[in-house]
Curated annotation (Swiss-Prot):
NCBIfam families: L-threonylcarbamoyladenylate synthase
One cellular-component annotation, GO: cytoplasm
EC number(s) from the headed UniProt entry: 2.7.7.87
Protein name: Threonylcarbamoyl-AMP synthase
């Protein structure tokens, strides 16, 4: 279980996790920008998150986790050589596009046979995944075509009371969103 980092009130993380379990959408800091998250198994929660952003389902979403076992249900078994490379990059700011399992919800994968996933090293995001007990949908906290939020004030300006909880904390220090790599080829899809 990931502990709450210093300066983060554990009750805020527990409250956000409770909101997630009830189908809520929450905001939290990540490696580079503020994120919006929800329970990936809850189609209504994902639809609400997508509506907040004005983002189509077909684009797919990223899942973050505190540890790789939280992602296992969503991913097809990986060849050993892939698993070694991927595991060596986690926890950390590397998102991988990997073959999805048949249990991966289409509303998260965008209807593709792959899924973008990351085991986060950000202490607040990891603590939230641990308190929730599983992986979360994670997307930048901004309406489509607007720049991602880099402060609590921007999150509030974009979404006001339309989100169910906000877990305070600092961003992880990256200037740009996490890189995304294709697990099959190793190619960078986003640097």
């Amino acid at each position: 279980m990931n502990e709450c980092p210093p300066g983060t009130r554990p009750f805020r993380v527990r409250h956000a996790a409770a909101e997630l379990r009830q189908g809520g959408v929450v905001a939290y800091p990540t490696e580079a920008v503020w994120g919006l998250g929800c329970d990936p198994r809850n189609a209504d929660a994902v639809a609400r998150l997508l509506a907040l952003k004005g983002r189509p389902e077909r684009q797919g979403l990223i899942l973050i986790a505190a540890e790789s076992r939280q992602l296992a249900r969503y991913l097809a078994p990986l060849p050993a050589e892939w698993a070694e490379t991927i595991q060596a990059s986690w926890p950390g700011p590397m998102t991988w596009v990997l073959p999805a399992s048949t249990r991966a919800p289409r509303w998260v994968s965008g209807g593709r046979d792959t899924l973008a996933v990351r085991v986060t090293a950000h202490p607040v995001a990891a603590a939230l995944c641990s308190a929730f007990g599983g992986a979360l949908v994670s997307t930048s906290a901004n309406p489509s075509a607007r720049r991602p939020a880099r402060s609590v004030a921007e999150v509030r300006r974009y979404f006001g009371t339309r989100i169910d909880a906000l877990v305070p904390g600092r961003l992880g220090g990256l200037e740009r969103p996490t890189p995304i790599r294709d697990g099959r080829s190793g190619a960078y899809l986003r640097r």
